[in-house]
């Protein structure tokens, strides 16, 4: 049957540092990196991540064997590349529960055996089944839990292990290793001398007898090359942050990964027209408005918020329609851009003459910004040395108005805003903090400002209501759901909501399926479902049962599902394209669900697009779905055959997001016959009809 809310994961990572490397079969190299498994040759450049089935993003080992390519994650998950060269199959997860790291680059293979050096043991794995054969924790007189393996190597029929106590060796019968009952006997290992498991020259790089002197091959006058592979007239030179190819006397730097270059992402913000902007802690921003990421742009003079971005859970990136962007760098004021952040417009700096509060001379602290309710500019809350924070209004032409000292706390956290119910005033929510910490005690201030459009562009004389925080803690993120008239928020340890006409924050009574977590971020989708990011447990989608804010049912998403990293620093929902974006230290994840799109204007007089059907002709089973798009969320969709018989109907949750996706099967679960089919979309008095062709 048709799949409701078709799901699709994408991961974007920076594939560095390189932890291990091995030559590919004909050309190129396989690389184990902190951003996934990378394949790089003269033409192609792919990074494989959990979205391709890996279930982990940080890999410490890779081997290329006659049985295929195998990758080993930081904590010992083992996966094999599928024959289609597209996805991966996880063979073994058993080691990950031990939470012991693999020694980077120390994964070897012989016959049908993979040998993995962990920090406290050596593991032997059956390559065919992926099952662990056994692990040894002592070799000779060396306890590996005390003197862990540093390097391993296979030379002929012997396995060598180097520790801080020297190198030991053991002769192995790799074909009959399962029957080697003495493998666990430490006495079968012997100390050896004169064996070098890493004999590269640390001072120079030599290819075909020629010493290469190119600067990219050296760091501090020492060779940056850790692996060297000669492949049919080409030599690949690889280091932790280096990929180069030497061919016909010419060295080519292949290090840069063009598709995604934003490292240390900590914040994402959906673009109203569709897409996302991401910010990094080292002061760069990058946008994706469709199928690719733009090159990162420096936010301000090379400054970044650095660890403050993580420590204080900064939410300082906001985006208006038509590409206007505001960003705050810790201590450095506000920075306005247009063209999705690629055209700097104006800097509002703390050492200039303006009304911003400062916590120190020439030093501003802002933890949150948001879009003004009428989309005329941005709002922010600035901390003040006097212990009374202020609220700022910044227009797109860089005018700033400050309501100084309107809060009672030293520090202000995230900020959110909406129009009052009579559409005259602004309601502004500011999370208060007794200290800068994301774990601080605090509450929530609710301000009612007259719209600046009625006050000559100035933010003046607010009414303030202060309420107790959830469990007395400061909120670290907030999301306004105007359709359902509720504000959702998270503290580091809790989830709460406050209805617009209430004066207190409440906890949902039941959140079935949600484990205790440290929360980092929150957003609400067009259906009123709540999404929360966590510090270590991935993302949860909390569905309201029977429309209740108090009864929620959780769906949990982790790296097993396709998330790049279970440590989620921020989330934001693109309601135009139906995508939730998630920020991680090693990249960005996106997750498409058809029900994440906002569809309330579809099939109305203000709709920007008419109902459409694609692809036509439609080939069922060809890894695609027939889509009937731009329909009302209250619509009913019926599909008929040429004889007028009803084949399928869609209603309710099946049309959430304004799109029906049909796999080409009838009510009986079988493929429909080739031919002409008709669709009818009914939404109140509006009816849209059309036809399409099915072919096999």
Placement of each model-derived feature along the sequence:
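Short, glycine-anchored, charge-dense loop/turn motifs used at functional sites
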Residues: 636-647, 677-679
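C-terminal tail/sorting-segment detector
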Residues: 676-696
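Surface-exposed loops/turns
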Residues: 565, 620, 633, 656, ...
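Extracytoplasmic/periplasmic beta-strand context in beta-sandwich domains
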Residues: 389, 442, 624, 660, ...
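Glycine-centered coil/turn sites that cap beta-strands in beta-rich domains
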Residues: 604-639, 650-652, 659-662
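Residue-level structural signal for beta-strand termini and adjacent loop
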Residues: 138, 257, 652-653, 677, ...
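Carboxylate-rich, polar loop motifs that coordinate divalent cations or form catalytic acidic clusters
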Residues: 1-610, 646
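Glycine-centered tight-turn motifs at strand-turn-strand junctions
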Residues: 646-672, 684-688
